[in-house]
UniProtKB/Swiss-Prot annotation:
Recorded superkingdom: Bacteria
Gene that this polypeptide is encoded by: atpB
Keyword Cell membrane applies: yes
Name of the molecule in the record: ATP synthase subunit a
Species assigned in the record: Glaesserella parasuis serovar 5 (strain SH0165)
Matches recorded under NCBIfam families: ATP_synt_6_or_A, PRK05815.1-1
Protein role: Key component of the proton channel; it plays a direct role in the translocation of protons across the membrane.
One Pfam family from the record: ATP-synt_A
Taxonomic lineage from the root: Bacteria, Pseudomonadati, Pseudomonadota, Gammaproteobacteria, Pasteurellales
Subcellular location: Cell inner membrane
Subunit description: F-type ATPases have 2 components, CF(1) - the catalytic core - and CF(0) - the membrane proton channel. CF(1) has five subunits: alpha(3), beta(3), gamma(1), delta(1), epsilon(1). CF(0) has three main subunits: a(1), b(2) and c(9-12). The alpha and beta chains form an alternating ring which encloses part of the gamma chain. CF(1) is attached to CF(0) by a central stalk formed by the gamma and epsilon chains, while a peripheral stalk is formed by the delta and b chains.
UniProt KW keywords: ATP synthesis, Cell inner membrane, Cell membrane, CF(0), Hydrogen ion transport, Ion transport, Membrane, Transmembrane, Transmembrane helix, Transport
PROSITE patterns per the UniProt record, alphabetical: ATPASE_A
Cellular component annotations (GO), alphabetically ordered: plasma membrane; proton-transporting ATP synthase complex
Membrane-related topology note: Multi-pass membrane protein
Length: 263
């Protein structure tokens, strides 16, 4: 943008539309685009469900059915309890994260430029490039881990799991508790930071490539387009892979919580 230094340009594109100060500020753009992504997924899948026929299905219906069967198969192979909750959860996680990730393919200048027309100073369009969004989803998974652990073993079994393992003696309860709590907390933290780190890096690379268009050197400007295209093609793989990893780890963590043997 005219009149901006490279640092200003990058800083502007990495700034959130937020309300409040400090720890309790809310990123309004993250909330908006995550809701839009969820609504988009629900709209298309609900339309397919309403228009589903027993005859020859359309191409999009085949595509949706293929995704549903694929996710259900993954849950069946990895989670050995009832799939009534976990299968829809896994499908929602994969599709929702995928759509949020896919927003990163929109040229980086378009969202802030559109926001400027509405009098909005800052706007970031990729919810999964915001640690608050990925951490929020990971905390939900964490709560489900606790729920399925208690459901499968009872509250007493849950307490034993975190106090009498790996050393089955009352004297080691403090040590066992620290070790198990660290292991437990590492799951949502790694889940959140893996998705956030990959999507933040992807967004930053798009921004750095866009900076090349602002360069005075014609060669750098000319290199911007092929680099942008190459990274966008590669990023499609990253987008899909990160959605798959988040879904699979969710399934695996819930499976471990549900099936872990009593100690």
């Amino acid at each position: 943008m005219a009149g901006q230094t490279t640092a200003d340009y990058i800083g502007h594109h990495l700034s959130f539309l937020k309300t409040g100060d400090g720890f309790w500020n809310v990123h309004l753009d993250t909330l908006f685009f995550s809701l839009v992504a969820g609504a988009t997924f629900l709209f298309f899948f609900s339309r397919v469900a309403k228009n589903a026929t027993d005859g020859v299905p359309g191409k999009f219906q085949c595509f949706v059915e293929m995704i549903v069967e694929w996710v259900d198969g993954l849950v069946k192979d990895n989670f050995h309890g009832s799939r009534e909750v976990v299968a829809p959860l896994a499908l929602t996680v994969f599709c929702w994260v995928f759509v949020m990730n896919a927003i990163d393919l929109i040229p980086v200048d378009y969202p802030p430029q559109f926001a400027a027309l509405l009098g909005i100073d800052y706007l970031r369009a990729v919810p999964t490039a915001d640690i608050s969004a990925t951490l929020g989803m990971a905390i939900c998974v964490f709560c489900l881990i606790i729920f399925y652990t208690i459901k499968s073993k009872g509250f007493s079994g849950f307490v034993k799991e975190y106090t009498l393992h790996p050393f089955n003696h009352w004297a080691f309860i403090p040590v066992n508790f620290v070790l198990e709590i660290v292991t437990l907390l590492a799951k949502p933290i790694s889940l959140a930071f893996r998705l956030f780190g990959n999507m933040y890096a992807g967004e930053l690379i798009f921004i750095l490539i866009a900076v090349m268009y602002m360069a005075d050197n014609f060669l750098l400007q000319a290199l911007g387009l092929p680099l942008h295209l190459a990274w966008a093609i590669f990023h499609i793989l990253v987008i899909t892979l990160q959605a798959f990893i988040f879904m699979m780890l969710t399934i695996v963590y819930l499976s471990i919580a549900y099936n872990k043997a009593d100690h």
